[in-house]
Amino acid sequence: MYPLFRFAKEMIKFRNAPRLAVTGTHVSTHVCWPWDLDPWIELNNGRTLTLFDLGRIPMAQRSGLIPILRDRRWGITIAGSSVRYRRRIRAFERFTMMSRVAGWDHRFIYMDQSMCKGAECCNQVLIRSAITSAGGIVPPAQVMAALGAAPDSPPLPDWIAAWSQADALRPWPPQLAPDAKAHLPA
């Protein structure tokens, strides 16, 4: 189930926070509740991705993106992600989430998010998102202009650029093995 009450709490908590630069870092604090756990009594890996919404969407609100999406009838979608899990977050532990836009290219905006306990990073996700309209993907330079920001991205870190290039090599739609195809409806 989506954490609607926690999402509402975050949006209310940061509704009057100072405006955030497009590449500024949004910092928020959270608790791992029992309903976030997997059978090993730690934060579930899928739930981790859901909880990252609690940082990413308030970050978008603080940067001024959400009102622009509404006014222009644009949407935002996740076009890819890469996650690293390194340390456990257990029941009732507090953690700090950092969310920032790392940069953009001609199609996508790249967001870097981390969850930390103290100074130790527990996990990190790289999110590639697209702003969409009825006509398709809105170029990020156009989105930045709407935000009053420079249309040119800061240089993408090498690891993000390499991930994007590697992902472009991935076949789509996926090439299914013959035994997998046998289970698809005709």
Functional labels for PLM-detected ranges:
Residues 47-70:
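Active-site helix/loop of acyl-thioester processing domains in fatty-acid/polyketide metabolism
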